């Protein structure tokens, strides 16, 4: 089965009305536009998304829906660093340091809380900066992702220089 478009999200439906099969993905697999996976029930699916979400697949995204059968995305829990900032200045420092490492950064549960995938050097940096943190198991859902850039990706727009030296995006 080849999936080319997302059909919706489970949060917009009553899952009890359907037979739901899941594709379990690690957080870093949610940004793939082309991939092959097996569902929990053993169905082979190929994903070739034409209009992939910029942030990637999210928890509950529906890949396939036919009558009462649904195949949806389940993002597996992974080891993450939960970061709790104390001030706006500390938020800026956290965003700068995590971004400087090109690491993924996600919104947390509260206003000054963030999550990033666990890496020992990042944990050591946060400790050195005196930033409150703890290592927990949690989902890193693309809809909560702060960073949008995708390494090694091609832009889906064309930039050219106009005769009056203005940048034109098409």
Swiss-Prot record:
<dbReference type="GO" id="GO:0016151">
    <property type="term" value="F:nickel cation binding"/>
</dbReference>
<dbReference type="Pfam" id="PF05194">
    <property type="entry name" value="UreE_C"/>
</dbReference>
<comment type="similarity">
    <text>Belongs to the UreE family.</text>
</comment>
<keyword id="KW-0996">Nickel insertion</keyword>
<dbReference type="InterPro" id="IPR036118">
    <property type="entry name" value="UreE_N_sf"/>
</dbReference>
<dbReference type="GO" id="GO:0019627">
    <property type="term" value="P:urea metabolic process"/>
</dbReference>
<comment type="function">
    <text>Involved in urease metallocenter assembly. Binds nickel. Probably functions as a nickel donor during metallocenter assembly.</text>
</comment>
<keyword id="KW-0843">Virulence</keyword>
<dbReference type="Pfam" id="PF02814">
    <property type="entry name" value="UreE_N"/>
</dbReference>
<keyword id="KW-0533">Nickel</keyword>
<dbReference type="InterPro" id="IPR004029">
    <property type="entry name" value="UreE_N"/>
</dbReference>
<dbReference type="GO" id="GO:0051082">
    <property type="term" value="F:unfolded protein binding"/>
</dbReference>
<keyword id="KW-0143">Chaperone</keyword>
<dbReference type="InterPro" id="IPR012406">
    <property type="entry name" value="UreE"/>
</dbReference>
<dbReference type="GO" id="GO:0005737">
    <property type="term" value="C:cytoplasm"/>
</dbReference>
<dbReference type="GO" id="GO:0006457">
    <property type="term" value="P:protein folding"/>
</dbReference>
<dbReference type="InterPro" id="IPR007864">
    <property type="entry name" value="UreE_C_dom"/>
</dbReference>
<dbReference type="GO" id="GO:0065003">
    <property type="term" value="P:protein-containing complex assembly"/>
</dbReference>
<keyword id="KW-0963">Cytoplasm</keyword>
<protein>
    <recommendedName>
        <fullName>Urease accessory protein UreE</fullName>
    </recommendedName>
</protein>
